[in-house]
């Protein structure tokens, strides 16, 4: 218990700066026309401002603290976004505009894959975004709820794809990851399912 308390007390949350909604970017049509998947990344890190802009574009608060930039079924907001970096793993809290530390250290290998199959290009990207479906918020684990959660995770991932294309970042949507390892690391229940991920970074010149 003492070790747990000590670990929590040492957690380093990141209060993100306000999103820059006037940042220079391509139009939606231009982003759609040029969007493509990228699997090689520069080692350049993303600043806190860039992380704020990225997370907001993915599933941030759009208005009135009750709506998100990405739609969800019945506005259930059941998609949780986790940010894997070299230093730690964070959960993005949209209302607070905060990255809440959930685990220290570099755990991006879990996003790359399993011992049987891994795509190590993921380790080049400074950030990986992992989408988790919280079925509790959808009302159950029936087939319909799972399907709606998967659709909503796809909506979130497409926000990643289009935002990255619009501002000069790059990404690729993926389903491969060590689901069991991520679930254990994040302390998820059997109703909280890691479903998709997007490594994000700058293109490698």
Predicted region positions:
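Short linear sequence motif anchored by a di-proline
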Residues: 9-10, 184-185
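N-terminal amphipathic, basic helical "cap/leader" segment at the start of enzyme domains
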Residues: 10-125
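Generic beta-structure capping elements
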Residues: 19, 132-134, 201-203
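Small-aliphatic-rich amphipathic alpha-helix that forms the alpha element of a beta-alpha
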Residues: 35, 54, 81, 127-138, ...
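Short coil/turn connectors at secondary-structure junctions
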Residues: 124-127, 191-193
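A glycine-rich helix N-cap at a beta->alpha junction
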Residues: 187-205
């Amino acid at each position: 218990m003492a070790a747990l308390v000590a670990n929590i007390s040492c957690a380093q949350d990141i209060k993100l700066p306000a999103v820059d909604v006037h940042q220079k970017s391509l139009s939606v049509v231009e982003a759609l026309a040029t969007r493509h998947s990228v699997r090689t990344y520069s080692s350049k890190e993303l600043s806190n401002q860039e992380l704020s802009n990225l997370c907001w574009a993915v599933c941030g608060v759009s208005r009135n603290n009750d709506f998100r930039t990405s739609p969800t079924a019945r506005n259930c907001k059941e998609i949780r976004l986790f940010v894997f970096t070299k230093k730690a793993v964070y959960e993005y809290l949209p209302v607070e505009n905060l990255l809440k530390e959930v685990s220290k250290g570099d755990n991006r290998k879990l996003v790359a894959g399993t011992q049987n199959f891994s795509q190590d290009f993921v380790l080049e990207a400074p950030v990986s975004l992992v989408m988790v479906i919280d079925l509790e918020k959808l009302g159950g684990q029936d087939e319909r709820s799972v399907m709606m959660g998967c659709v909503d995770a796809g909506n979130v991932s497409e926000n990643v794809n289009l935002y990255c294309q619009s501002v000069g970042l790059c990404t690729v949507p993926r389903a491969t990851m060590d689901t069991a390892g991520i679930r254990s690391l994040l302390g998820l229940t059997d109703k909280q399912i890691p479903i998709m991920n997007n490594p994000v970074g700058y293109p490698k010149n």
